[in-house]
């Protein structure tokens, strides 16, 4: 039967989206926007005349057709990559696998990745995102960017971006918040770190009201919900400067609290490779700017 001419890029985007389990994580791996991933998958579905994913409130669910297509593409792209590496003489390319906190990846690292690739083409950087603490050894990684206070047993770590936290919300809601005590009248969105809001209210000198809003394991998810006016989120300001600059979020109060910062970590007993050293120097340089 006649088959449509399927664009290789759309097939590749679908393969990555299936493997990562979300358009957001696929966008990080491919270094494009989430909208670009969604567009390419929709284009492929249109050409094939069938849905490859079900879009639900719980995320992406592959259809039977998507599950049928994925292993064929995964094997094909893997085989193609191996052959191209041999033909292109990529023996000097050094793979570096880095696990990254999702918020840091999307809000800080992604806008800078192309500059790193241009400056260091000899490093094949492979990013894996995680909303919780990245486990380097268990996940087969070389390094990880974590949020916390440092001092992880068996690991060396260097500090990166600071992350003072403050309440952020939609500008319309911010205009109605005149005093920190007013936060007791609105929904307080929260992360799984339950001490954050009480710590901020202590810094503000105001009793902490009941914090009963929905819990999220991602600051990006909290920020997106806050932009809709659904409540106030306690977020690391340095990660969401673009949201504030674009008028999507506003900071109603100047009080901040620090519960940790971002670190680059690696196992203490692992000798640093050239790629690890290069990436470490680049990250610390970018953080200092």
Curated annotation (Swiss-Prot):
<comment type="function">
    <text>This protein is a positive regulator of gene expression of cephalosporinase (AmpC).</text>
</comment>
<feature type="DNA-binding region" description="H-T-H motif">
    <location>
        <begin position="23"/>
        <end position="42"/>
    </location>
</feature>
<dbReference type="GO" id="GO:0043565">
    <property type="term" value="F:sequence-specific DNA binding"/>
</dbReference>
<dbReference type="InterPro" id="IPR000847">
    <property type="entry name" value="Tscrpt_reg_HTH_LysR"/>
</dbReference>
<dbReference type="GO" id="GO:0006351">
    <property type="term" value="P:DNA-templated transcription"/>
</dbReference>
<dbReference type="InterPro" id="IPR036388">
    <property type="entry name" value="WH-like_DNA-bd_sf"/>
</dbReference>
<keyword id="KW-0010">Activator</keyword>
<protein>
    <recommendedName>
        <fullName>HTH-type transcriptional activator AmpR</fullName>
    </recommendedName>
</protein>
<dbReference type="InterPro" id="IPR005119">
    <property type="entry name" value="LysR_subst-bd"/>
</dbReference>
<dbReference type="GO" id="GO:0003700">
    <property type="term" value="F:DNA-binding transcription factor activity"/>
</dbReference>
<keyword id="KW-0804">Transcription</keyword>
<keyword id="KW-0238">DNA-binding</keyword>
<feature type="domain" description="HTH lysR-type">
    <location>
        <begin position="6"/>
        <end position="63"/>
    </location>
</feature>
<dbReference type="InterPro" id="IPR036390">
    <property type="entry name" value="WH_DNA-bd_sf"/>
</dbReference>
<keyword id="KW-0805">Transcription regulation</keyword>
<dbReference type="InterPro" id="IPR037420">
    <property type="entry name" value="AmpR_PBP2"/>
</dbReference>
<dbReference type="GO" id="GO:0005737">
    <property type="term" value="C:cytoplasm"/>
</dbReference>
<dbReference type="Pfam" id="PF03466">
    <property type="entry name" value="LysR_substrate"/>
</dbReference>
<comment type="similarity">
    <text>Belongs to the LysR transcriptional regulatory family.</text>
</comment>
<keyword id="KW-0963">Cytoplasm</keyword>
<dbReference type="Pfam" id="PF00126">
    <property type="entry name" value="HTH_1"/>
</dbReference>
């Amino acid at each position: 039967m006649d088959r449509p001419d399927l664009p290789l890029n759309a097939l590749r985007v679908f393969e990555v989206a299936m493997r990562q389990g979300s358009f957001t994580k696929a966008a990080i791996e491919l270094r494009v926007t989430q909208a670009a991933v969604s567009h390419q998958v929709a284009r492929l579905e249109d050409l094939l005349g069938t849905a490859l994913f079900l879009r639900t409130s719980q995320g992406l669910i592959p259809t039977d057709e998507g599950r049928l297509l994925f292993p064929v593409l995964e094997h094909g792209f893997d085989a193609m990559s191996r052959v191209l590496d041999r033909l292109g003489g990529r023996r000097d390319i050094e793979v570096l696998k880095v696990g990254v906190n999702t918020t840091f990846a999307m809000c800080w690292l992604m806008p800078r990745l192309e500059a790193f690739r241009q400056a260091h083409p000899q490093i094949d950087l492979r990013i894996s995102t995680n909303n919780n603490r990245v486990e380097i050894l268990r996940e087969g990684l070389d390094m990880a960017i974590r949020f916390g206070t440092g001092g992880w047993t068996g690991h060396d770590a260097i500090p990166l971006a600071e992350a003072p936290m403050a309440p952020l919300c939609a500008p319309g809601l911010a205009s109605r918040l005149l005093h920190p005590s007013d936060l007791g009248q609105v929904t307080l969105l929260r992360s799984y770190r339950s001490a954050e809001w009480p710590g901020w209210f202590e810094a503000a000198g105001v009793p902490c009201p009941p914090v009963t809003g929905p819990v999220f394991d991602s600051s990006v998810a909290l920020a997106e919900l806050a932009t809709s006016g659904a409540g106030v989120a306690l977020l690391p300001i340095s990660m969401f400067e673009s949201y504030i600059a674009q008028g999507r979020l506003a900071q109603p109060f100047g009080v901040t609290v620090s519960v940790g910062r971002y670190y680059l970590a690696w196992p203490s007993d692992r000798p640093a490779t050239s790629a690890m050293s290069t990436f470490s120097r680049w990250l610390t340089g970018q953080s200092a700017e």
